[in-house]
Amino acid sequence: MHGLPVMHLVRVTGGRYVEHDVHRPEVPLGDPVPFTRTAPDRPSRPAVVGADLAAAVAPVTGTAAAAMLAAFEQVRARLDTTAAQSGSPDRAVLRLGRAAVDAAVRRCEQGGTLDDLASAELIALLRSDEVRDFAYLRTDGSDVWHLRLWLGLTRRAIPGYVAGPACLAGYVAWRTHRPELARLAVHRALSDDPGHALAAILLQLLDESVPPELAELLLAHHRPDSGMEPPMQ
């Protein structure tokens, strides 16, 4: 991920993990530590799952899809204008993205939902790695609305914009011990963007059955309450 300082470098293989020197990646810091896998090893492709589970990441159709397409057209035009008028388009996108993420988090915390325009704007801004990383730092998976937010945006995203919200949905599903749902979301992300780095990392964690508790330990230093935020570029 871009813009985040590397605090820990961990290699996971064969049910063991070992931390490496950040500045000298070839140097391990201690012996490999075994961990308890959360589930039996699974193939990279998700197995046959229930219709309800598959529907949780399936794209919307009909009038809902048409409404989102119209919303995206409005949002893209507005974002293009904003970027063109800004002396630093990347900085403008990051500023808008942070505001959109914070607004979505506040609204969902209060039990609300995002309308089509707000959804389209956030989804479009998540194409920025820096905005996606900011959203990732804001997502801890402690409440059901985290999963509901990112799954909803995954379903409403148009082709070419799915990877960001789908990857975040997969992350929250993994963190909340829903590996099959996480796998479906990650594969939606990779189908939309085969080179998506964070989705590839999540798929590896799922394939290794790495427990999400280990991720929390490693990610604790990157949380917003630790004072470490992705820098404005």
Please identify what each model-predicted range represents:
Residues M1-Q233:
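Charged, compositionally biased boundary regions
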